[in-house]
Amino acid sequence: MASKTDSASRDYSVIGTRPVRHDGVDKVTGHALYGADFSLAGQLYGKVLRSPHAHARILSIDLSNVLKHPEAKAVVTFEDFADSPRPSRAYAQGAPVTENILARDKVFYKGHPVVAVAATSPHVAEQLLSLIDVEYEVLPAVFKPQEAISPEAPILHDHWANEAMPDDTEGMGANVAAHEVYQQGNAEKGFETAAHVVEREFNTKSVHQGYIEPQNATAYWTPEGRLTLWCSSQGHFSVRDNTAEILGIPISAVKVVPMEIGGGFGGKIPPYLEPLAAVLSKKSGLPVKMYMDRTEVIQATGPTSGSHVKVKIGVSANGKIEAATANFKFESGAYPGAPLAGAAAAVFAPYAIDNVRIDGFDVVDNKPKTQAYRAPGAPIVAFAVESVLDDVASDLNMDPMDLRILNSAHEGQRRADGVINLRIGAEETMTAVKNHPHYNSPLGDSPSGKKRGRGVGMGFCRNNTGMACAIANVLPDGNVSLIEGSVDIGGSRTAIAQQFAEVLGIDVTEVHPYVGDTDTVGYTSVTGGSGVAFKSGWAAYTAAMDVKTQMIERAALLWDCSIDQVDYKNGRVFHISDPELSLSFKEIAGNMPETGGPIVGSANMNPGGSGGSYSANIIDVEVDMETGKIDILRVTAFQDAGTAIHPDYVEGQMQGGTVQGIGWALNEEFFMGSDGAILNTSLLDYRMPTSLDLPMIDPVIVEVPNPGHPFGVRGVGEANLSAPLAAVSNAAFRATGIRILDLPMSPDSVHSAIDKTS
């Protein structure tokens, strides 16, 4: 189902259709090559020795027994990397941390890489790890942000004790990496005038992105000093740049070939294995292939932050928000980089609030370094804010959506993080929820006597953009080879090709999109931040406009007239003064040799204006008051897509994000031992929702065009994860009358809350 909010008048021929994805046949027939499918003749296999401790000092590493083994071809420790500074508090999310690739002199989490080896087979490489003798001094560890900020907590990074602390962190310990403050108006005065104030504290645990394909890399470092990497990542240019920096070699010496990728959700942006495979290849003189197993993925790759969040909202008697504050402490794991800015942008974004203060703290602890996960930071704060708003609505005896619509953000208003809204779809998305049959239908009673409830929640992602390039080669038969630089995770190749085809009025099946390697196409930023359809789509649009201009020039040459006498429409050029003179796209393509040679369109750009996206969910649940188990009965997902280039893919993103959000709300968490070991390191034990757990999710596309894009595109890959957490929580609250403040709402935690209330 699609809601055409204000886009019905737009007349597109390709955009808004649902063509078969260009890579679909290869993927369903098994012909698509993923990273682990790639091999080179004579390759070695690399494996990693990981720390058995959550926090320890490395006293010595004895490699003598390994080096004696006839099938050991290379061994790598931190000393083999280029000299790099120790991570400071200023390290941002996504910055390469060499010490996370291999530990320097301390390990900071169980699973932290210490040594890498290469051997003639993966089994031998695994055996070699047992020959390495590492002596550790085990140190006290800390695993929760609320505990890590204490001055008494063990300090992870010793040198931080001598660095200046972030502002306004009095009474906190040296594990605080950053404190960010955003404010407008005067929140304290706003609360003084408020007729009703609600304040709550929430806790969420680390969850993993749960991509189906583990990390992998194959490297070959030639004798001439040229490094080629084949890997599955969310950005091969980022892998190239980060690997070159970690290894201390020129970017020009590294080529990265992108393989197909089996999911990422933000977790496959940083390099993990690529630098290791590269150095092992350099030392052995042979190609080296590496891949993680699932235990390694969960033990040692970035989850999202665990958190402690405090939200306070004050409203007038009629529900108008007078003031709001948010204080959140996000764990970043072993190294700094928690998504404070993303959380600050999202926390109150759906609403117009004059008086706001936001405090975000980045806290390191003894867990794997966190990485991005669909709208980094936003789902956590949306869970808190949307839960508080539902409590406000309940206290005021007000419809939850009426409260939200009354306070909805609009164009021209300033977000708390300083951004002034352009055209946005907050109210349109809320109104779509309010008017939907799901929201207005009776919930019904459970035949088994269980408690039922219906909840709503709003979400937001600011969306990002970045640099993007595209090259369009027109072929003599009128087809087009379109080379772009964005790794395809969610069907973006087809969405990019649709935007190209729309400009030229040709069939999208005649456009053949490819993801080029780092030597083939210009720099393109990572597939993340919901930016691909926006930035690479815009690059395709610009390349198509370049082709269109050249088509007009070729026709003018054939007709011996000026270019202002030629126009282009619906895949044909025609003479303005003589309608009988007309040529199709294919006809001009066939005449390229006679009119000047190849037609190649290109684009290199760094567009701004990606435009934020709003989402919402209506979720019905059933709660078993005896066991605490929550079952999902019905789900409707809403999202402002700006313009839905390929509605199937938009709906798929909405459904997928909703599933992940429900998993975050109900099941997903790391079970940690007292020693910092993650105990559920398989997908049997790390419980993600399956089709057996959920009903069909009904997607509703809202279209409020983004004025910052030629076709009005907004990214749709992330905001959809933010709303389900609160929608499930609010549904459970309305079913039971009990507000559960911690995620996940597992049967055990819900049952405990019921017992306490009883």
Annotate the PLM regions.
Residues 1-172, 197-200:
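Flexible, low-hydrophobicity surface segments
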Residues 241, 260, 264-285, 289-290, ...:
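Thiamine diphosphate
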